[in-house]
Amino acid sequence: MEFSSHHIRLLQQLDEQRRRDLFCDCHIIVEGQMFKAHRNVLFASSGYFKMLLSQSCRDMGEPITATFDVFSADTFTAILDFVYSGKLPLSGQNVIEVMSAASYLQMTDVIGVCKMFIKSSLDINEKDRDGFFSLSDKDTDSNGSGLYAAGWRTESSPTHTHKTTEHGSFIAGYNYPPPISSRLQHPFSKSPRKPELVRKHRRRLLPEALTPALSHIPLGDLVGGSTECMLHDEETVESVSQEEERTQTQVSIISIKVEDLDATSNSWPESPPQESLDQGSALHITKAEELYKAMPTILGGVSGWGEDELSSGRFKCPFCTHTVKRKADLKRHLRCHTGERPYPCEACGKRFTRLEHLRNHFQTIHEAGKLICRRCKLPVTKVTGRVIQDGTRRYRLCQACLAEAGLDNVNFDYGEDQPLVLPPENEREHCWNFKEEGRQENGSEAAESDLVIQEVVDSEEDELKQKQD
């Protein structure tokens, strides 16, 4: 026979012992505040304490002291109350801190409860909201006060979190508009738009050219009635009911027109004409998924046109929250986590994650360090070239250019740090001119000597011929 209340009484007794400081053999210090607990309870409820206490199980006679600086004292108080009572006091202010501390202490149950609390607090579905908006006037007059009291609150009510019994979702910190009964007290208030009409207006917009029957309907009537309604005390309920009936009739007309136009949407052009886009008094565009039906898919996923949520054409990194549109970008991003560097440099062996990084490295490091002759622009090395200092400038010349300058007979035994110093500019110009003039004179003398020799040879041959004759 099992007693379901036994573990509850056991936890209550252990909690009473903790509060009275009885048999507490574990002290936890958080922000200078000491918390006393039993090591058996902490061992059974936390993976971190299980690992910590199993290493010090030999010292059973003395109490164990542990210090934490990763969370606050209030956060640890909430976790310790959960360990001894099974009740976790969560709120919108401490849920993130409690989940972070539970993750550090390896308490999976607390993490799951925090995730459920966050999801239920922030996830207010449109279906639940439509449940309030779709109430008829009859239901509102009969039992509308009880429903609105549970789910709706005015702007003056304090911010709190509670759970509705009918819809099963938390409503936290949201100022919804008051019900119809409270709007009737303000005759000059604006009537809100119906969410179903807003949704149809956002997802199914009709072109003006294909809906001549709807062109005479004002835009304000399509999205929820007139802009301002003057409500009197006697005709209030009747005007509201008539307005809702007229709105529902117009919604049915719109849905019928949309269904008729879906069959002919394949023959429409890829983009609507510019004239229909410029007119703002009517609805111009059809459903986006039909209008852009002929567009190609991107990497197996079609991006959602006109959707508020994240499109299915994106790729999410499994290690972080980064999302990309292309699979190649995701593959390149994963190298940040895996450490893969598939592009090595052939000159120095350094590896890179991206090809453009390798190109930039090669251009700035290796190609920028090439030795080039200043005069002929040919590549040189430390053996075939020499550093020349011209005043404050230093550059390198090859052996051919040094020979042209008349510096080929200079001794190059001293080091690279000591450059060859050129003579002053006037002497250097005279040297260059002298070499050029000497080269020209030598060429002219050689030409004249060749001519003289040729003439001598010709005269000797003529004399020999004359003698033979």
Curated annotation (Swiss-Prot):
Gene3D superfamilies in the record: Classic Zinc Finger, Potassium Channel Kv1.1, Chain A
Record bears the keyword Transcription regulation: yes
Limits of the BTB domain: 24-92
Gene for this chain: zbtb8a.1-b
Superkingdom of origin organism: Eukaryota
Keyword Zinc-finger attributed: yes
Cell compartment(s), UniProt: Nucleus
ZnF locations on chain (C2H2-type): 315-337, 343-366
Protein name: Zinc finger and BTB domain-containing protein 8A.1-B
GO BP, sorted A to Z: regulation of transcription by RNA polymerase II
GO terms for MF: DNA-binding transcription factor activity, RNA polymerase II-specific; RNA polymerase II cis-regulatory region sequence-specific DNA binding; zinc ion binding
Ranges annotated as spanning the membrane: none
Keywords: DNA-binding, Metal-binding, Nucleus, Phosphoprotein, Repeat, Transcription, Transcription regulation, Zinc, Zinc-finger
Gene Ontology terms: cellular component: nucleus
Lineage of source species: Eukaryota, Metazoa, Chordata, Craniata, Vertebrata
Function noted in UniProt: May be involved in transcriptional regulation.
Organism: Xenopus laevis
InterPro entries on file: BTB/POZ_dom (IPR000210), SKP1/BTB/POZ_sf (IPR011333), Znf_C2H2_sf (IPR036236), Znf_C2H2_type (IPR013087), ZnFinger_BTB_dom_contain (IPR050457)
Entries under Pfam families matching the protein: BTB (PF00651), zf-C2H2 (PF00096)
